Amino acid sequence: MCLYRFPLLSNLITLFLLVPWYASAEPNKTRDKIVPQPIQEMFQSNLVYPQEKDEIQFTLFPSFSKNLSGQKARTLFEVEYGITDAFQVIFEWDGLLYQNPVTGPTIAGPGNIEVGAQYSWMALGDGNTHFSFGNLIELPVGPVANGLTEGFIEVQPFIVLARDFPELNQSQIFLEFGFDWVDQVRNVPESSAPGFDSISWNVGAFFPIGFWRATLEINGSNNKWDGGSRNDIYITPGTIYELSKEWEIGIAAPIGATKTSDDYRVVGYLMREFELD
């Protein structure tokens, strides 16, 4: 992928590379303020919360989806590790993929991997506003000959802005905005669809009720601006239960709201978090 074609992408990657230096050089203004984290993950959005230093989190997101072309399933596995209290590295693997197309044989196999990082500025202003910047790079290591994966390398910078409401049981609303630049780097069958750059956005909220967390997301992704035909929007209600300080479990049912969206999805969630020291 030629970065001179995408000056904004070049600037975002430069900022991403400077984040670790900034994290060590930034004056410590809000570190003494403890920001509650009633929830660790959402189902189809990134949250602003970072892992603390030497804290590691394992998350499993099994999912199933159905649309006019067939059925799909995957077992997304994610690892997050805190380098500092504000800077974390991320590893994701699509796990085992399964596709049952309406026309064609059923196919299955391992998916792609993603690596990246995220830096968070917590407790800004009055202490209830947070901001983070991150970037993920998807590497096309999955099989392409059978069409299970598409052979794209993808660069996915994103930002998240969140606002807490302590008077409402530490509930939160957030906005995420991101880009997805794609470039086909592996040979694929001639019938494969070309790749288009896309814009993604997520708006969501969660509300803690005892050990339960009610969640709601509106998730969008659009590549029409780059010549594609996809405009996906999902309404994603979900619920998460805090089994303990280290364990969470949940389920969500994203509902497609546009013609190009899946008819429906089911997303599971299992999280384990612990400190290494």
Say what each PLM segment does.
Residues A25-D277:
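Transmembrane beta-barrel domains of Gram-negative outer membranes and organellar outer membranes
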Residues M1-V35, L276-D277:
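Cleavable N-terminal export/targeting peptides
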